[in-house]
Regions:
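Basic, amphipathic N-terminal segments
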Residues: 1-241
Length: 241
């Protein structure tokens, strides 16, 4: 097994490798995974810039080793989005270990299909809504119950920015195939971090307020959706390499 890693550096460390301070890239025999610690809450210009930088780095890797590896995108810090992780606080371990994301149909020429992305992301939202009753039934804490009710909306508000990033990263060029996109997945490492309340921000902006009061939530210290991602998704696709 071979692994190449672009390490995410803290703000205290000087500089960052290839300017990709928010990404971690692992290259295995069976493919490449891109782990994003920041779930794309920046403005459009910042998102497209990061996608372009990352694309250039991956193409350099592929050209250097003469490969076109399948790429798996992992948004690894969902605890930084208000309400999302609280939704799963009362679920049993088997549910929290399930993969939460989508694997794309194989395309010889790479790229990502807009209709496929829309359908799969909307399906994930519908799964949250379908499981809301079970989530509420297992949680008596009122703050958590409020988060459970908000979680599908918070998750839905990530869709546009994630698509902007993925579409920019995997769009093809005239004389070459696009990068080999395989899927997008969401995880939480159990660590607490600063949170973004996308729903409150959207509502405040819609009524003319530029700022809103954000209340930090109780962090969820359980790991979510990471247990089987490597074994059940990435390693199972070894024949693509």
């Amino acid at each position: 097994e071979v692994r190449i890693l672009i390490k995410e550096e803290s703000e205290e460390e000087k500089g960052d490798l290839f300017g990709l301070e928010k990404f971690q890239i692992g290259w295995y025999r069976d493919g490449m995974f891109i782990s994003s610690h920041n779930p794309f809450v920046e403005n459009n210009e910042q998102i497209t810039q990061k996608a372009d930088e990352l694309k250039s780095t991956i193409k350099t890797f592929n050209q250097a080793f003469g490969v076109s590896l399948p790429i798996y995108n992992v948004i690894s810090n969902m605890g930084s989005i208000s309400d999302f992780c609280q939704f799963f606080s009362a679920f049993d371990e088997s549910k929290r270990d399930d993969v939460f994301g989508a694997t794309a149909p194989y395309s010889k020429h790479g790229g990502i299909d807009a209709d496929w992305f829309n359908d799969e992301y909307d399906h994930l939202i519908s799964e949250l809504i379908a499981n809301m009753s079970n989530a509420l039934a297992g949680q008596l804490n009122q703050d958590y119950r409020n988060s459970i009710a908000s979680a599908p909306f918070q998750f839905g508000l990530l869709k546009q920015n994630l698509w902007l990033f993925l579409n920019r990263l995997y769009r093809g060029e005239q004389l070459s195939d696009a990068l080999q996109f395989r899927g997008f997945y969401f995880t939480h490492d159990g660590q607490s971090s600063a949170q973004s309340d996308l729903l409150a921000s959207t509502v405040s902006y819609s009524v003319g307020h530029e700022h809103y009061q954000h209340n930090e939530q109780i962090p969820v210290n359980q790991t979510l959706f990471a247990q089987y991602l490597m074994t059940h998704v990435i390693l199972s696709e070894h024949e693509l390499v």
